[in-house]
Every structure is written in structure tokens, then in C-alpha cells.
Amino acid sequence: MASLTYHEQKDIENIKKLRGLIKELPPFCADFFRGIEPLTSTRTRIAYAYDLHVFFDFLHKENPALARITVQDIKLDQLDQLSVTDFEEYMEYLKYRFNDKNQEVMNKERGIMRKISSLKSFYNYYYRNERIKNNPAALVQLPKLHEKEIIRLDVDEVALLLDEVEQGDKLTDKQKNYHAKTKTRDLALLTLLLGTGIRVSECVGLNISDIDFKNGGIRIYRKGGKEVTVYFGTEVEDALLDYLEERDRIIPEQGH
């Protein structure tokens, strides 16, 4: 049997985690996750599951009609009785709350918007399938986002960063010992990230077989599992080739 890729391994891990999360929700929620499975990634469904956990915990704590029953005992027809006001109270609750570990949790506009968007999808599934008569989530206005300026490194800052990785002048003697062993690898990683703009998670999922030197591109998987090719220049190519050449000379220790 062929070994699994990084993405296949992560997908299996996510499926196991998702099944555990669904068991903690009301039984009817399983239908929702089956319904959206063909159109979503496991990571997206896990995010939905976490968001629903917060919502049902809110109902259990703050709604007098549901306070005497467990989250797993909440019925779909009870959700049908909620109003827009209940959702507005939930949005207020999300700004500042305590989680199950009695830790303070705060949400900004983006976090609140994501959780409400999850509920809109959740309610829409049951409304579209005629299992509830009301869809108050569709009437809730999402919070206005205040866009944050994206901070980028300028050309000089990029050069300084790569020089520091290559030279390691400011490292301690102990750090320099590690630096000598990992410098070429670290330089390849940073040059790839800076030269292509891929996410760290996308870089983590790369295999050597995903690199196409002939066409100057790497195969990555975007959010939702979409496969795309990102192209790179000669500087990235040189850094990758230097590392792969060094890698071929490394003799792994037994058990690695």
C-alpha cells in the first residue's frame, strides 16, 4: 500500500477529530455535516463544528427554555423558535465570554462574522430542506469589518533577513552549531516563502515531488483542497537546488 501524502494524513486526522466534535452536538447536527460534505473541506467542517459548539453552549447557558437540558438534548424544533433578537444577543455574548475552562475569550468583528456566517449556513441547510419553518439567521446583519493594513517587508528588509539566515553573525556559539546544519534548508524555506507568497501551511504540505523545475512551479493545495501551481523565479530555484543537493549528501541516523 502506497504511503499517504501529508494532505491525506491530515485529512484522516481531521475526519477523526470532526467525528468526535459532532458527537458532542445535538444528534440532528450530523445531517448538516453530511449535507455539506461534498462542497467543503474537513478543515472547514471542523471550523463549523467549533462554531456550533459555542452557539449551543450559549443557548444552554443563556436561554432559560434550554437551561435545564443538555446540549445533546436540544431539538431542531427548538431552534425553529429562536428570533433575530436571540442572534443579536449571541453576537453581544461573543464579544466577551468565558469558555468551558473558565478562560476569558474575546472576539473582534472578523471572529464574530465568521461564527454568524457558520450559523447562516447551518440554518439555511435545514430551511432549504424544509425541516424548519423560520430562518432568523438569514435576517441577521453581519458586523462591519475594519480592514487592517497589510504590513509587508520592503526589498531591503527581505535582503537583511536572508543575509542573517545565511551568515548567522548574531548567533551564540551553540546556535551557530545548529545554524551550520540547517542554514541551507532554512534559506531555501524562507526564499520559497518570500519568493512565492505561499502560506506556511501550504509550504508544510510540500513534497519534493510537488516541485517542477522544468516549468519553474510548485504544486500546492489551497483552502478547500483546491490544487494550484505557483511559479517561482531563478532565486527560489537556486535556493531549492542548493538544499536538495545538500540533502542528498546527508546520511540519516538510524531510526530517522
Model regions and ranges:
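Conserved catalytic core of the tyrosine transesterase superfamily
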Residues: 1-256
